[in-house]
């Protein structure tokens, strides 16, 4: 993997922080940069739950990890900087979102023009490559969605879900149902985030080439979309359809300024668990 040495402009090489796949953090006030955990592969999704536990999704290697400070996690390639890392931390997932061999759904295999060659892979979630992560802790979706992990499956052109339960000092991740399937082969969600209003916001890369294809003539640089997904109860939707109106299930969050709140109100916001933004 590409190595980096991070430091402010002018920092000598020996004083920089080396990276070769990791999760890092930066303190915006103290201007401090540090590696939080080492390893994984293409960790393109990172979020934390209501208890402050961090999780990441990885691409190609097993997809779900519980991230703890100082942890050293499974790599796709290369070596950990610490030569005494005799065994690294593996995935918490008890499943995959594909069946058979990775090459059946990868760019180097028979899948050249898209689509899924393996019906079992389609049923399991679409493929081996994942991107983004949103742990739903918002006020809008039904209660059964709280704590669900929502992330993209690139080859499956969909959003999939996992859910966790405690196990010893960590968790085990279980296979959930698909959240969204798109009928557009160009659909590739890169980021999923829960907004202050409780809606799910997702980006769509929109490109013909799903993954790893160095074919500039096929790259599309004119599209790209941002979606907001809101929960509307079935009855409300049916009534809206009958009246040929837009459903009234989305209510914008009223403007707020936490700097104007009293200490008592701030304390109440700090301990509530309905909305992770407050």
Positions of PLM-derived features:
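Beta-propeller blade termini and top-face loops
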Residues: 1-268, 274-278
């Amino acid at each position: 993997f590409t190595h980096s040495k991070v430091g402010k402009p002018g920092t000598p090489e020996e004083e920089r922080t080396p990276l070769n796949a990791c999760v890092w953090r930066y303190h915006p006030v103290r201007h401090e940069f540090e590696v939080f955990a080492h390893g994984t592969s293409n960790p393109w999704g990172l979020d934390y739950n209501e208890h402050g536990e961090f999780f990441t999704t990885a691409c190609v290697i097993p997809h779900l990890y519980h991230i703890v400070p100082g942890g050293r996690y499974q790599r796709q390639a290369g070596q950990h900087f610490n030569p005494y890392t005799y065994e690294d931390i593996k995935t918490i997932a008890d499943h995959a979102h594909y069946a058979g061999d990775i090459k059946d759904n990868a760019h180097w295999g028979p899948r050249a023009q898209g689509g899924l060659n393996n019906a079992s892979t389609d049923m399991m979630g679409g493929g081996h490559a994942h991107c983004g992560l949103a742990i739903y802790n918002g006020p809008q979706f039904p209660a059964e969605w709280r704590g669900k992990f929502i992330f993209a499956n690139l080859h499956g052109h969909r959003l999939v879900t996992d859910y966790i339960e405690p196990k010893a000092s960590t968790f085990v991740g279980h296979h959930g149902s698909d959240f969204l399937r798109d009928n557009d082969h160009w659909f590739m969600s890169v980021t999923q985030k829960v907004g202050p209003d409780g809606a799910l916001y997702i980006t769509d890369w929109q490109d013909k080439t799903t993954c790893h294809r160095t074919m500039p003539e096929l790259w599309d640089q004119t599209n790209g979309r941002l979606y907001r997904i809101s929960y509307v109860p079935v009855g409300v939707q049916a009534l809206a359809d009958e009246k040929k109106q837009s459903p009234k299930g989305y209510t914008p969050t009223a403007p707020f300024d936490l700097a104007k709140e009293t200490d008592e109100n701030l304390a109440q916001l700090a301990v509530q668990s309905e909305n992770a933004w407050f």
